[in-house]
Amino acid sequence: MVQSLLNDITYEDQLTTVEGNMFQMIYGISEEEVEEYAAYVSTGATAEEITVIKAKDEATAKSIKEKLSERVKAQKSSFESYIPKEVEKIDNAIVYQEGVYVILSISNDSEKAETIITGK
């Protein structure tokens, strides 16, 4: 799924991998809460972002979903004064949970991202 989100959606900016301490700093999620994850953020001045997380269990996944929703709110607050044109992307962000999987996608094409994420 991560590769589909990276390859099948056109991004304005290059996305870079987020790992280790940076992952915890950006999302407030410790590596102990997750079994595996892939996270990518914009290298420049866009809000574009992809995060796919496999949580330890469904309760943790629910908590992670809340943290990703908080990330979206923080990004909106930050970009409103910084680069207002990015707010539309943030307003259309997808934060999705299915079982132990939690996904965040911020892009120009939220419809396509949602199709990739949900399979619908």
Language model segments and positions:
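Soluble, non-membrane globular domain cores that form compact, hydrophobic packing
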Residues: 1-120
